Structure formats: C-alpha cells, structure tokens
Regions:
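Domain-level detector for secreted/extracellular nuclease and nuclease-toxin modules, and
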Residues: 1-261
Length: 261
C-alpha cells in the first residue's frame, strides 16, 4: 500500500528560485534518468508498508518496527538550507498498525539513528519534521551514529553538491532473531547498509557500504562493498530502473577514486 502525503516534486514547488534553478540544472545534467531511480525492490519478500513522505520513500516493516529501507534523491540545492534540526521524534501518522514511540529507545543503550538524516533535510521544514518520524529511525550504536556513519552522511552531501545529485538507499541488516528494545519490541539491526548512485564524468557510478552496529572508527574505504555484494546480503535489488547493461556494469564493481575516497 502506497501512502502519499506530499511528493518531493511538489515540495520543491514551494522552494526558492535557486532550488528550482538547481533542479533544472540537474534534469539537464541527465535528462534520460528514469523517475524514482532510487526505489529498490525485494529479491526475497518480507513484510512492508510503502510510505512516501516529502523528501524520501520508506518500506516500513511492521514486525521489526523499523524500516526495511529508506530511499531518496539528494540534489545540490538540498545540501543548503536554514531549517534547523528539530530533535523532536514523533510517531509516523501514516504507519498502519503499531509504530514505536520515542520512549522505546529510552535507556536502551542505543541512539535513535536516522536513516534519511536531518542534515539532508535543511532545505524544507516539512522534510525536516518528517525525517524525525520513528519509521525513519533504527536502534544504532552511539559511536557509530556520531562517528563513521555521520562521516558518510557528510560525504553524501559533498557528492550531491559536487555532482548535482545522488541517489541513496539505506537500511538495516537483520539477524533471524534480533535483539529487541522497548515495549513495542523494536528490532535491533546487526549492521546497516548504504548505497549510492551518481553520474560522475558522464558515467554512472555506484558504491555501497556496510557498517556493523557497534563502536569503531575506520577509514570509510574499509566499509566499501559492491552493490551486488550488498544485494546478496540484504535480499534487495537496488536501482532496478537502470538499463540492464548499465546496472550490470555499475553493480559488479566500485571505484573509490571516482568517489574521491
């Protein structure tokens, strides 16, 4: 079931001229890119409710009470903005059935870890508010959340600003019997994935990362994986709207130099 509130394209209509100009520049950069290129599909099925918010789309897992994945396009103009971080976590009104609340995370030993981060949402007040919905949150190790994961979020904004736009999908990697927290039994991921697609020097490039849900500080290159490797681990097919020949090329390998790593 797809729940639509305000699509990203609609939200952009309310933005400044600079936002519109940047969006036009992005469309000129790659006019043949299919719409919603970031939306993945499952290779192996799992419970989900598909929800579309202002700035991102998510697949919510009603058994785990966390997202299966969160996907969005980040554009150059969206890396700028003055909407301040809210730090007010809310129940997602579009989740059917049980949605966790902020108290599930209290004294759990885990951060309320964003998938679509607040730092990517400063361009629009609705986007900022909705990224604090608990459907966009996973239990995340504090040191990971504030450390290497945050470093990658900042890299993503750098890439969007440099290349015009970047397509992003992220989410949890789960065990068969995960630890749970809170009265709503929110599942704790074993690890997290994040994959990126961008047109760099007129060629599509993709790269992925896997982080174990624990403390540690390493060079980002040590987390790198091919998209094919992450698909095998997660059971999710990323960027399926790419032409097959392009998809097969960019997903079998990655080039850290192309991404400036």
């Amino acid at each position: 079931m797809l729940t639509t509130i305000l699509k990203k394209s609609d939200a952009k209509d309310t933005q400044t001229d600079s936002t519109t100009e940047s969006a036009e520049a992005n469309s000129l950069q790659n006019p043949n890119a299919p719409d919603l290129l970031e939306i993945p599909r499952f290779i192996t099925s799992r419970p989900e409710q598909l929800i579309e918010h202002c700035a991102y789309t998510l697949s919510y897992n009603p058994n785990w009470h966390i997202p299966n994945w969160v996907a969005y396009e980040l554009t150059r103009s969206e890396t700028h903005g003055n909407n301040e971080r809210e730090d007010h976590f809310e129940i997602d009104p579009d989740v059917k059935g049980t949605c966790p609340d902020y108290r599930d995370y209290s004294n759990s030993g885990y951060d309320r870890g964003h998938m679509a981060p607040a730092g990517d949402m400063k361009w629009d007040p609705t986007a900022m508010k909705e990224c604090f919905y608990l459907s966009n949150i996973c239990p995340k190790d504090h040191n990971l959340n504030k450390g290497d994961w945050n470093d990658l979020e900042m890299k993503a904004r750098h890439w969007a600003n440099k290349y015009g736009n970047v397509f992003i999908v992220c989410g949890p990697i789960m065990s068969d019997h995960p630890e749970t927290i809170g009265k709503h039994d929110v599942a704790v991921p074993d690890a997290f994935f994040k994959v990126f697609l961008a047109e760099i020097n007129r060629q599509w490039q993709a790269i992925g990362f896997i982080f174990e849900n624990k403390a540690g500080h390493r060079d980002l290159r040590t987390y790198c994986k091919s998209i094919d490797e992450i698909e095998s681990t997660t059971g999710i097919d990323f960027f399926p709207k790419l032409d097959d020949d392009i998809e097969n090329t960019v997903e079998t390998q990655y080039n850290t130099n192309a991404w400036g790593l």
